[in-house]
Design a protein with these regions (language model features):
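C-terminal regulatory domains involved in ligand/effector binding and gene-expression control
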Residues: 1-79, 165, 183, 192-198, ...
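N-terminal positively charged helical leader segments and presequences
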Residues: 169-172
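Active-site beta-strand/loop microenvironment that shapes enzyme catalytic pockets
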Residues: 80-128
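Short amphipathic alpha-helix segments
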Residues: 143-161
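Short amphipathic alpha-helices in soluble, non-transmembrane regions
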Residues: 152-158, 185-194
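Terminal, non-globular segments
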Residues: 176, 183-185
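Short glycine-/aliphatic-rich beta-strand segments at the starts of folded cytosolic domains
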Residues: 131-146
Length: 227
């Protein structure tokens, strides 16, 4: 089974503007890591635009995109939040939030005009953004006795595993990150190198990565846990 471990998002806050019949729409798009990030961003935009008539928004989170919200903030139902969310989806993004502030120009735009304005301002913010494919990584912690340090460090180097942190007190503790789709095989190869056994022999000791992590302790003075 193929593991999908990338998603499209933006790297930093970007801005898009749209004007129609005197009304001005300013869209602010920002990357999100969790739902709790968005209220802070929304409050920041509100403080920057206290005289705006509306602060409409939408966000989507997660690999499956099942976590989302859209809000019209007083605009006619379905004319603001949904068009904003629609552009998030049209650009194929997730872990993204957008706030669009509207300054009323004195002329009503009607339902179709509002939908077009919120859609276009959001699209412009995304056109101004740097869109990237972000890789999802698994984080592991390796604990080991000092006599295993040469084997552990050699295995990490040979497999070019990314080291996040190192701590050497009573024992060695190293945190590493591995691309999610490659983590099971990489950990298997790491174990084989440290054990000085073949992949086949190592597989006989460890039926699967999940079994190994669930059981906790591992032989040969090395302990690996998934964080």
């Amino acid at each position: 089974m193929t593991i999908i471990d990338t998603y499209k998002t933006i790297t930093s806050t970007s801005i898009g503007e749209f004007k129609d019949k005197g009304s001005k729409f300013i869209a602010y798009a920002t990357p999100l890591s969790m739902e709790g990030d968005f209220p802070l961003f929304l409050e920041k935009i509100k403080k920057e635009h206290p005289k705006a008539r509306h602060h409409c928004f939408a966000w989507r989170l997660g690999m499956d995109g099942n976590s989302y919200r859209a809000n019209d903030d007083g605009e006619p139902s379905g004319t603001a939040g949904r068009p904003i969310l629609g552009q998030i989806d049209s650009f194929g993004l997730t872990n993204v939030g957008v706030v669009v502030v509207r300054y009323f120009g004195g002329t009503l735009l009607g339902t179709s005009g509002l939908i077009a304005a919120y859609k276009e301002s959001t699209a412009e913010a995304f056109r101004q953004a740097e869109i990237i494919d972000k890789i999802i990584e698994d984080i592991f912690e390796i604990k080991f006795e000092y006599d295993k340090m040469p084997d552990v460090m050699n295995a990490l180097k040979r497999l070019t595993i990314n080291i996040l942190s190192q701590n050497f007190n009573e024992s060695g503790i190293i945190k590493i990150s591995i691309r999610q789709s490659e983590s099971e095989q990489t950990i298997l190869h790491f174990r084989a190198l440290v054990l000085k056994k073949s992949i086949e022999e190592t597989q006989m000791l460890l039926r699967s990565l999940e079994d190994a992590l669930a059981s906790g302790a591992w032989q040969e003075g090395v302990f690996i846990s998934k964080l």
